[in-house]
Amino acid sequence: MSDGFGRPPPPAPAGHPTGAAGGDPVRVMVVDDSAVIRGLLTRALEGDTEIRVVASVGDGQMAVNALQRNSLDVIVLDIEMPVMDGLTAIPKLLAVAPQVKIIMASTLTLRGADISMRCLSAGAADYIPKPTSTREIGGADAFKRELVSKVKALGAAARRAGSRTRGELRPLNPVPAAFLKREPPPVTLRPAPAVGSVGQVKPDVIAIGSSTGGPQALFEVLAHLKTGVTQPILITQHMPATFTTILAEHITRQCGMNAQEAKDGEPVVPGRCYIAPGDFHMLVTQRAGANVISLTKDPPENFCRPAVDPMMRSILRAFGGRKVLACILTGMGQDGLKGCTEVVNAGGTLIAQDEASSVVWGMPGAVAQAGICSAVLPLKEIGPYIRKFASRAA
């Protein structure tokens, strides 16, 4: 089975912490109105010894009640349920436990993609394309591996943020003093990354790569770029087909930008935002002296299609390294490291999101720790940085 991204499921990243913080299992709640689906998801998750399903409930209201009683790291949340649906439940869940990570389980339909995007805007951390039948869930190894990988990565992120949810602190009955003294496992932050040089030439193109947590990060960054930035913006966000169409629509509505899912052969023009469509690599090639979009079904890179690395390499060839401003936002894995290294070596400029503001510091962490970034910034500073850099004198 495909995992929804046109790629085989990724293996666990090298050096990734076990469990959520190298110790206790990731604590998960499964929320779905189908008892059969809940059972299948629970078995898939508990097939990994570093995950423990501590609650399994049938609607959003039950999830809120369960979260008040349980300490959780990750919630796998269905979208359409009786009593309280997933979209309605998200703000209520985050009000109880602001740092808990929520993964939406969504069907690969336009309606499912649109609601998933609204859920991400409301605070969900990620989504997973849900198979359409219980038979597919029960027998789909790719789906199980993707689910487990995301739960473990987001569980680790929750603990690194110091957010192991303390639902037990909320009951009306007195809490034993011994319980109150318990602390979450210690978290060791990585040392500050080395910072490289800043390009001296006004860029002709802006290229952005993102994955887990990317839609929310893109909305934040692009909201600062709707005026004052004339360069074309090319974005590869790891997403399946259908979802990328909806992502472009949401960027247009929320950020006031001219965003669209890229089409093969269309020219790359100033002031437009191009989104790589799901299951295609988005490249820039030159035809008759003009830069145009080229969509390919070349093999996945870094287990991804679309992938950031081929986009970066093609932009480097089309525009020249010194004319490229690249940015890597939150995401799992190391996609973008090789392509961005080539951009920087050719004189381009690279910035990345910092660990504290990333949902998962995999992709930005890889380029930051490689020492090739001109700046490693909190999410709220990235949009203003890009705008200032892009509007500098030539």
Curated annotation (Swiss-Prot):
Q: Where in the cell is it found?
A: Cytoplasm
Q: Which CDD domains match?
A: CheB_Rec, REC_CheB-like
- Grouped into one coarse class, the protein's main location is cytoplasm
Response regulatory domain location? 27-145
**In the Enzyme Commission scheme, what number(s) does this protein have?**
3.1.1.61, 3.5.1.44
Does Cytoplasm count among this protein's keywords? yes
Q: Which GO terms describe its biological process?
A: chemotaxis
CheB-type methylesterase domain residues are 191-393
Q: Name one GO molecular function term.
A: phosphorelay response regulator activity
**What's the family?**
Belongs to the CheB family.
Role description: Involved in chemotaxis. Part of a chemotaxis signal transduction system that modulates chemotaxis in response to various stimuli. Catalyzes the demethylation of specific methylglutamate residues introduced into the chemoreceptors (methyl-accepting chemotaxis proteins or MCP) by CheR. Also mediates the irreversible deamidation of specific glutamine residues to glutamic acid.
| Annotated NCBIfam families | PRK00742.1
Identification of the protein by name: Protein-glutamate methylesterase/protein-glutamine glutaminase
